[in-house]
């Protein structure tokens, strides 16, 4: 299958930034790969926005830029030219764009060094940043297996979050109050 330049860029971005996910996508049916490359490249762009600068305002501007892209998709307005935004507008519709806005807004937590007040706040963050992403990627809507799907995604989200704990601490974040981060850090080595 021949991919256009934007999809190739998304695949390359994913290969560099999230090699495990890139390899997983390479195991997917060939006709689905462009869609997955674009969705998960979007996630790379969103998830790294707060970490490429120490200035919260710049991170907020980057996240707002993506919210504006999603608003353009929702409003069926021509999306600005960008190697991830342009193909994203080809692969998702209004419903998915609205869901992805929740994901982008959840990433605002990453901009600041605030801690989660309790586990329910962490669960909401994990839901908004992972379950929504996988639901959009899978093309799922509420259905017979929605709860099972959500539970599987939450397990993935929590495992990834715990593995990221050492990096979060290094970046000055407080992953969650009362969480034994030193123990988790040792287990992740």
Feature map (PLM): residue ranges:
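Acidic catalytic motifs of isoprenoid enzymes
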Residues: 1-189
């Amino acid at each position: 299958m021949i991919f256009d330049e934007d999809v190739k860029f998304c695949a390359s971005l994913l290969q560099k930034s999230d090699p495990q996910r890139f390899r997983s996508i390479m195991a997917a049916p060939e006709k689905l790969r462009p869609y997955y490359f674009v969705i998960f490249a979007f996630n790379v762009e969103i998830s790294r926005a707060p970490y490429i600068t120490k200035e919260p305002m710049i991170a907020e501007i980057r996240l707002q830029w993506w919210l504006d892209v999603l608003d353009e998709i929702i409003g069926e307005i021509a999306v600005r030219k960008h190697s991830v935004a342009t193909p994203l507008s080809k692969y998702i519709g209004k419903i998915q764009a609205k869901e992805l806005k929740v994901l982008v807004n959840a990433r605002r937590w990453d901009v600041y060094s605030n801690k989660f007040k309790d586990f329910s706040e962490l669960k909401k963050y994990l839901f908004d940043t992972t379950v929504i992403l996988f639901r959009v990627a899978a093309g799922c809507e509420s259905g017979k297996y929605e709860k099972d799907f959500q539970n599987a995604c939450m397990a993935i989200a929590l495992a990834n979050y715990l593995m990221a704990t050492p990096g979060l601490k290094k970046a000055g974040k407080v992953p969650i109050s009362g969480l034994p981060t030193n123990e988790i850090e040792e287990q992740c080595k």
